[in-house]
From Swiss-Prot:
Its EC number is 4.3.1.19. Induction: Constitutively expressed. Not induced in response to methyl jasmonate (MeJA) or mechanical wounding. This is Threonine dehydratase 1 biosynthetic, chloroplastic. The lineage of its organism: Eukaryota, Viridiplantae, Streptophyta, Embryophyta, Tracheophyta. Pathway: Amino-acid biosynthesis; L-isoleucine biosynthesis; 2-oxobutanoate from L-threonine: step 1/1. Expressed constitutively in all tissues examined including root, stem, petiole, leaf, immature flower bud, unopened flower and opened flower with the highest expression in opened flower and lowest in leaf. The gene is TD1. It catalyses: L-threonine = 2-oxobutanoate + NH4(+). It comes from the Eukaryota.
Amino acid sequence: MEVLRFTAVKSLNSCVRPEFTAMSSVIVPISTVKVSGTRKSKKKALICAKATEILSSPATVTEPLKAEPAEAPVPLLRVSPSSLQCEPGYLLPNSPVLGTGGVTGYEYLTNILSSKVYDVAYETPLQKAPKLSERLGVNVWLKREDLQPVFSFKIRGAYNMMAKLPKEQLEKGVICSSAGNHAQGVALSAQRLGCDAVIVMPVTTPDIKWKSVKRLGATVVLVGDSYDEAQAYAKKRAESEGRTFIPPFDHPDVIVGQGTVGMEINRQLKDNIHAIFVPVGGGGLIAGIAAYLKRVAPDIKIIGVEPLDANALALSLHHGQRVMLDQVGGFADGVAVKVVGEETYRLCEELIDGVVLVGRDAICASIKDMFEEKRSILEPAGALALAGAEAYCKYYGLKGENVVAITSGANMNFDRLRLVTELADVGRQREAVLATFMPEDPGSFKKFAEMVGPMNITEFKYRYNSDKERALVLYSVGLHTILELEGMVERMESADLQTINLTDNDLVKDHLRHLMGGRTNVHNELLCRFTFPEKPGALMKFLDAFSPRWNISLFHYRAQGDTGANVLVGIQVPPDEVVEFEGRADSLGYEYAMESLNEAYQLIMH
């Protein structure tokens, strides 16, 4: 049970089970209608007939699933998460098609029915959320996968695949790469099956995560700065040692294990279900649930939920092919995946109804909702489906229906709770962040306070500026209704106090609200947001790239409680040196975004 640290290898050779190789997908254009309807009657009759035939006979399939060999891989289209914009709760619809080859629906259904995941996993409860149900006017049901032995659904897929391995393969051991829940699932499964497990994690993995894996008896190896480097090492070591690589989502046996969640929901809730909301990272959970339910209860909508900045499945369905995100947000780290799986995409393209996108604030609000409902704290990815369900119900005005949200995990990093607390009321629309201009005259502050009226000020920042005729006040107010905010803004404007709503501006919420010190005129300042890896030497690597070549005029570091930290940097770069600056920024390998044109920066800091 040692913890080893190595330099990452560069080889990308993989070692996966010979029974499964990835399969190609068929390109299907996305529909342009807002909400997809019920399945075509022909398809419904076909799959219902299949389901009747299968369910009436004993399930005996225990062999590992097999798939056809893959064709040569085609380079994936690289896209930005921000290239797909929609309102929270809007269903980005998918137009499902009949199967296109590969592992059949019959095989998935029979394997889910005969899965042995209950040797280690629990049949988790389906609990009603009374407070949320009353607030939304629908019956909200929570599928409590956060109550599994490793506090995540991932144990199902890992164990199902490992339990099907021949004895001689188990004796050689297993290996996986993961920075979170999949690692614990593989470690516990190996413990129960009596085999050796090596878990490869990035060196940036928080101590609490790798120590949890170590306690389960696995060997933890810390390699590389990113998941990709850890995965490359794991696959190379699997090949050299003859170990079986256990993928986190893109394998039929893993998908089958996750599909048992859908089987349980269908058994636990006898009333008609309008929709089941499923968090999506690589797609294993939603693919498994859809593979089962669309063959036994095809009228139930299966809806994926993704963060706005980690929307690989939504963009893949939009483009009709798997795509690779050029960068991915790390707040909901359990679903921070740049590319969905080949087999998971094939199933999603065939079966699911669409995807809903939600922002970070909404996820934080749902974490708070869950705490108030059940006194449980979900991780961001674990609250994702609940946020999507709430947004969908509000957008479409859904009333009186049954909706199910899968609370997929509770491995919350404690350090992240500070940020969740700050953003939860914003996500609930119970707090607004505003900026108001007022004259630098005696009595202006009192006039401002009178205009705020009875509203509760939760945050206030002001600094006198002798060089300006107007001061800028940045503040937050508590809300009961949106009408309160509209009324206050109208009062401000009628008193010639220009007021701007910055509630949806992440730059303000992450950085600028902590930097109020007055506006300044810094020549040639470029404002950038970088994501630093949480490891020693990250800052010096950054400074070596830019200093003393250019002057750093602003620096604000904000730990996020995960493997990366948000850093806001101002650097004075003459116009004729911008190309050189961008080249150096690209060479760092840190994700970054330019913020110089951000409205809030222009108002507050410049």
